[in-house]
A protein has these predicted regions:
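Extracytoplasmic
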Residues: 14-51, 65-69, 156, 256-263
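Extracytoplasmic gate region of multi-pass secondary transporters
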Residues: 33-38, 232-294, 348, 381
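C-terminal ends and interior cores of transmembrane alpha-helices
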Residues: 87-100, 313-326
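Hydrophobic core of transmembrane alpha-helices in multi-pass small-molecule transporters
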Residues: 24, 92, 104-120, 248-249, ...
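Interfacial helix-cap and linker-helix signal at transmembrane-aqueous boundaries
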Residues: 40-41, 72-73, 154-166, 266-267, ...
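Helix-to-loop junctions at the C-terminal end of transmembrane segments
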Residues: 65-78, 291-303, 389-390
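Cytoplasmic helix-loop-helix junction between adjacent transmembrane helices
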Residues: 109-147, 360
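Helix-loop-helix hairpin linking two adjacent transmembrane segments in secondary transporters
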Residues: 144-197
Length: 398
């Protein structure tokens, strides 16, 4: 896009593009659990609830690390935090090929990948959008949020195919390789602030723009204290609790329930794993469209109205899903996949915008805590659905 300097691309867009690549690479694991649970269960005899526990630990850390990661990015730099995070994802995914016991699954899938993905979750996207853009913030937030969906779209079919043809270990190595490839790209291009590139944020008016003060560099302890202070500050506002509860429901109904258990549930109904993985990939396609469109709408419409609409559509979709699962894909399932895909994380841009609008300079860290609620909801749904499946023999009541 043209910038204030003529027809050259503003550096903000290059930074956003690299952030998209990093989020895409980290999203490789988001595609993995649903596709790998069946082969892991067949090889090791692990129950669905045990594997769901590992995913739940991952999802909890993915959320709880986020507000601290936002503070760490302020203290130590975005590039440093993201490079370490991608390395942890690679170690967790690559190390999992050596597993022989279920407790090791908790370490690799749960601890390492949970910390890695949590350190560059949606607070990373919010940090880039808020620091590098004055105009188009909502659109950029939508585009970066879509990075995870694009990762799911790209990784899910090959992960499922590799797990079925070459074995789950090769699928895990694919995820590890993708994370490692992104590290040098992030290190070469990513910078903390527009002033590091000698420019203003995209869309800033040179006559009126005043750069916000940079947080003082400090220790990890001071960064953690800043994250806790953000929670204490936000918890005194009813708006925070409304956003957190709504986002917890969002996490439960996406990452926790559908993201983890859709493929095993479809497999229970006789559908091939690769077919179910293909359907989730289609969710990823429409998620990209829905999230980018949601970002554009967030710049133009009251975010509160958007959230009411998004949650309403999602509730209707979940009510009808148990009657749509079968051994083949019917037109009604395609309709569900399209609608659910458009709605998947369309909630993120308006939620981030409301955090920025209500909490000002603390908005990014507060959004980190709201996102933590999202992942707590996801973890509860992932574990709960696994327990229901093991206890009742069906996902219907999940």
């Amino acid at each position: 896009m043209p910038s204030e300097r003529g027809f050259r691309v503003h550096p903000a867009w290059w930074v956003a593009a690299v952030a998209f690549v990093a989020l895409l690479a980290a999203a490789g694991f988001r595609a993995a659990p649903g596709a790998l649970m069946v082969p892991l269960g067949e090889e090791f005899g692990w129950s669905t609830s045990v594997m769901s526990l590992a995913v739940s630990i991952n999802l909890v850390l993915y959320g709880l690390i986020a507000p601290f990661a936002a503070a760490l990015m302020d203290r130590f730099g975005v590039r440093q935090v993201v490079a370490v995070a991608l390395t942890l994802v690679a170690l967790g995914a690559g190390g999992s090929v050596l597993m022989t016991a279920s407790w090791q699954l908790l370490i690799f899938w749960g601890l390492l990948i949970g910390i890695g993905t949590g350190s560059m979750a949606l607070v990373f996207a919010a940090t880039i959008a808020n620091r590098w853009f004055v105009k188009r913030r909502g659109l950029v937030m939508g585009m970066l949020t879509a990075g995870s969906a694009t990762g799911q779209l790209i990784f899910l079919p090959p992960v499922a195919a590799l797990a079925e043809t070459a074995g789950w270990r090769w699928a895990s190595l694919l995820v590890a390789a993708a994370a490692l490839v992104a590290v040098p790209i992030v290190w070469a291009v990513m910078r903390d602030y527009p002033s590091d590139r000698g420019v203003l944020p995209f869309g800033a008016d040179p006559a009126t723009y005043v750069a916000p003060p940079r947080p003082a560099k400090g220790s990890a302890l001071s960064a953690a204290r800043r994250a806790i202070d953000g929670l204490v500050f936000a918890s005194k506002h009813r708006s925070f609790w409304a956003l957190a509860i709504a986002f917890a429901i969002c996490g439960a109904t996406t990452n926790g329930l559908i993201g983890v258990h859709f493929i095993p549930s479809a497999h229970d109904h006789g559908m091939a794993t690769t077919v179910a993985a293909g359907l989730l990939a289609v969710v990823g396609v429409f998620d990209i469209l829905g999230t980018v469109a949601s970002g554009w709408l967030t710049d133009k419409i009251d975010p509160r109205f958007l959230l009411v609409a998004y949650y309403g559509f999602r509730g209707v979709g979940l009510l009808v899903l148990p009657w749509l699962l079968a051994d083949t894909v019917h037109p009604s399932m395609i309709i569900f996949i399209v609608v659910y895909g458009l709605d998947w994380v369309a909630t993120v841009p308006p939620t981030s915008a409301l955090c920025r609008e209500i909490f000002g300079e603390q908005g990014t860290i507060v959004f980190g805590w709201v996102f933590a609620a999202h992942q707590l909801g996801a973890a509860a749904a992932a574990l709960g659905a696994g327990l229901i499946r093991d206890t009742l023999g069906t996902y219907t009541y999940a």
